């Protein structure tokens, strides 16, 4: 069975840290979907469409990475995609505790 992970975030902007997480995730998962989420509480630097295009350009030669815009609940988006895993980055124990609570 194909192991598909969703890497959700606002990615405004998509950083080298985000790229590192995706690249490391590709050693574990068959496919990663980068979910560019709408966050009405954040004033964005880039439009969601521009964020999607920029990330697609980074991974244009890698069929294992797909980039999709979404709004709504991340869990619903996971089910819609058939993703079995969430890929998350953690900078410290505070991030870990926050993610664990979700």
Residue ranges and their predicted role:
Residues 1-102:
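Nucleotidyltransferase catalytic core that binds NTPs
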């Amino acid at each position: 069975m194909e192991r598909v992970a969703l890497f959700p975030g606002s990615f405004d902007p998509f950083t080298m840290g985000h790229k590192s997480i995706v690249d490391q995730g590709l050693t574990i998962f068959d496919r990663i979907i980068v979910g560019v989420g709408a966050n009405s509480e954040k004033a964005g630097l880039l439009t969601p469409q521009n964020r999607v295009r920029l990330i697609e350009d980074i991974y244009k030669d890698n069929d294992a990475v797909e980039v999709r815009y979404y709004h709504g609940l991340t869990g619903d988006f996971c089910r819609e995609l058939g993703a079995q895993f969430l890929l998350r980055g953690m900078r410290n124990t505070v991030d870990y505790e926050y993610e664990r609570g979700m």
